[in-house]
């Protein structure tokens, strides 16, 4: 039911229901609503719902406003399409971005792949444009600059005069401070950041854009798979022999049931590390069943 979906969205979602000016439904109300829907009751035509207005002051700067202030616009890459190392100002941290030349590839897995997931077929052609991808997974060192507001604390401690970019970066919404250590004792320095929502991952990219003046976003599912396959058509970017997997990834049989520091295994042909293991990554778009028509862009 669309009504159920709208009433159970995050409260800061612009489509969130109930009607404007009313409090969210209680757990009891939601239970009754679900029972009502399951019993096949029709929604009265006279009843109208309108989404609750967002409080932009509380929610922080919007993506479109942030990117407009930064002067970003859609279009082809104007600068040289090459790898670079990005420094995060006010910290001693930096990360590498690698250029991924676009092209067409087969997204998904063939039916004869014994390790394929049930949602990985039918395999279908997809085209992707040029893009950049981080050489490594985002580390806690990088992520906590935003999540714990360490970037702002560093500027204040070192009495660094605030710039326009600082103000925009500070306006990006931050998550609620965690109640427990989200590394669960597995280590933080040099380790990949985990346990964030997709929204938090998007907000981090917004903050990183404001902090650096370069446009950052999550990769699409197609871009991620294209980068993972790295121009190959085998089960793994290194071939079909799963016995070689431990040379390229951390997985359940060699990781001692915990994540490991980034970049310790061999990279794939595109120079990207930990694409076959260690931790999962968020992508920009949502899952949709594969289409069978002509290659998608």
Q: Where on the chain are the PLM-derived regions?
A:
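Short aromatic-glycine motifs in intrinsically disordered, low-complexity regions
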Residues: 81-95
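Short, polar loop/linker segments at the starts of domains and inter-domain junctions
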Residues: 7, 17-19, 107-128, 259-265
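Short, well-ordered junction/capping motifs at the entry into regular secondary structure
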Residues: 249-276, 294-297
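Mature N-terminal segment immediately following signal peptide/propeptide cleavage
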Residues: 92-107
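Active-site microenvironments of metalloenzymes and redox enzymes
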Residues: 37-41, 107-115, 127-239, 247, ...
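Aromatic- and Gly/Pro-enriched helix-to-coil junctions and flexible linker segments
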Residues: 1-83
């Amino acid at each position: 039911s669309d009504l159920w979906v709208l009433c159970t969205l995050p409260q800061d979602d612009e489509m969130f229901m109930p009607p404007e000016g009313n409090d969210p439904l209680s757990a009891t109300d939601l239970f009754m609503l679900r029972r009502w829907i399951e019993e096949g009751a029709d929604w009265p035509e006279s009843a109208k719902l309108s989404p609750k207005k967002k409080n932009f002051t509380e929610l922080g700067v919007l993506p479109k406003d942030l990117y407009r202030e930064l002067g970003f616009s859609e279009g082809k890459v104007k600068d040289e399409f090459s790898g670079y190392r990005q420094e995060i100002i006010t910290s001693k941290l930096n990360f590498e971005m690698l250029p991924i030349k676009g092209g067409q590839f087969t997204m998904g897995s063939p039916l004869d792949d014994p390790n394929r997931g049930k949602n990985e077929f039918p395999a279908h052609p997809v085209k992707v444009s040029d893009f950049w991808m981080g050489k490594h997974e985002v580390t806690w060192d990088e992520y906590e600059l935003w999540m714990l507001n360490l970037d702002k604390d560093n500027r204040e401690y070192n009495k660094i005069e605030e710039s326009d970019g600082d103000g925009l970066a500070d306006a990006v919404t931050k998550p609620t401070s965690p109640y427990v250590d989200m590394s669960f004792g597995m280590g933080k320095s040099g380790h990949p950041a985990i346990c964030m929502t997709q929204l938090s991952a998007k907000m981090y990219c917004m903050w990183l854009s404001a902090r650096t003046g370069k446009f950052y976003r999550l990769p699409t599912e197609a871009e991620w798979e294209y980068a993972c396959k790295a121009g190959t058509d085998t089960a793994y970017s290194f071939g079909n022999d799963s016995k070689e997997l431990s040379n390229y990834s951390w997985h359940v049989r060699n990781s001692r049931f915990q994540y490991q520091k980034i970049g310790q295994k061999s990279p794939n042909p595109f120079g990207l590390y930990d694409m076959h293991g260690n931790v999962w990554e968020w992508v920009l778009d949502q899952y949709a069943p594969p289409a069978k028509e002509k290659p998608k862009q």
